[in-house]
């Protein structure tokens, strides 16, 4: 009996040991972080990123990064496709990007990305009431003798938190005149105190914002079309609010609900790579058709006083490819044509600028141009 009793006790001990092992779930730890904003990301504190023991998995508490700096296409923050009531607002677009790329926003984003069933809302305090009122771009830009200029590539980028903020930054004649002067809209005899912002914004080519500016010169009204490439704009939002609705998966992992996490959000709008081929037919001597710089000079792309170098702004304004440094590659006659050439250039974003894909490497662009051939 004593031997049987000892065997029974050993059996109970072994059963108890394996019983403990069997009831402990496999814990998938979320990323820890020293950045605590609505969640610490420390599994030992019960904060962001901690695992709540479930039989089926882990619940992750989203832990937002204190600063989020991104770059990319304008379409990530402004709906360039839809119009009217179907147009998505900036809050919705940022929320969609957070859901698709949580690793860019949360310290434990890689874990959150593997979980289904949770959703995101964003509050950037964007003013829904437009302050750009008056005539539409199609009307004011058609006024006779409208002077056009584009913000120079050497000018500084503009940090805004909304289009309303952009207008508020141009709240004096002095500020408006200064930005016009930087855009080749210089009128030495215009009344410096008469510069005003008028009418609605325009938007063309998917990458150029148009502002209507008026000023008084010799008793008459000057009408100006000030173009600002969207790649000159950085969206900067202090304390962007992010809230997450919990998932409710019966098996596997889950994401916990959190409200009003805040981050400092900066978005550098990238350069659109598409080019618009020139439509004018400038004169080109037949003897110059084999020399790329002379072909580019005929297009008006070279610097004043130095025809061996390209003028970045002249090239940009012609092709609609802004804030790049350009170098010539080739100008090759199109086969079977006497007056049409394929032009190839290399374009590299200037310092602090990027392409829509977030890179700033040099890329080759090409387009066709037609000339009026002269000489024998």
UniProtKB/Swiss-Prot annotation:
It is found in: Cell membrane. One of its GO terms (cellular component) is plasma membrane. A lipid is attached at residue 31 (N-palmitoyl cysteine). A lipid is attached at residue 31 (S-diacylglycerol cysteine). Residues 35-59 are annotated as: Disordered. Disulfide bonds: none annotated. Its main location: membrane. PROSITE patterns: PROKAR_LIPOPROTEIN. It is a lipid-anchor. InterPro entries: Lipoprotein_p35. This is Lipoprotein p33. Residues 1-30 form the signal peptide. Keywords: Cell membrane, Lipoprotein, Membrane, Palmitate, Signal. Belongs to the p35 lipoprotein family. It holds the Pfam family MpPF1. Residues 38-51 have a biased composition (Gly residues).
